[in-house]
Amino acid sequence: MYSAVTRGIEVTVEPFYLEVQSEPEENRYVWGYRVTIVNNSSETVQLCSRYWQITDANGHVQEVRGSGVVGEQPVLDPGDSYQYSSGCPLTTSSGVMVGRYQMKGEDGAQFEIEIPAFSLDVPEQRRTLN
């Protein structure tokens, strides 16, 4: 698991390879990831938007922006947590994701919190001899 804390808000990411959805012979590798956001701060916050930077093993970078996460803009009171799962396809057997969430505090001011960088790696990648 990968974790980062910004302004008392902890973001933890747990990636996992989705072998059933992947087709390595077609250069299609799919990962899921589970994100847990814990509000350890003293104020109520709302997740407004997300930004992801996804880099594959060839250095190709894809940027993803959008409002909320999985169709929601959750509000977290102090001590609350929120969890969601999503996925990411790549054309290479490894990559890296990193990002940030745009949050809004009780006073309406917006601020960013870090999503930790995490690696996407095929477990036990098989090697073939020609």
UniProtKB/Swiss-Prot annotation:
Signal peptide: none annotated. It comes from the Bacteria. This is Protein ApaG. InterPro entries: ApaG_domain, ApaG_sf, Uncharacterised_ApaG. Disulfide bonds: none annotated. GO terms for biological process: error-free translesion synthesis. The gene is apaG. Residues 3-127 form the ApaG domain.
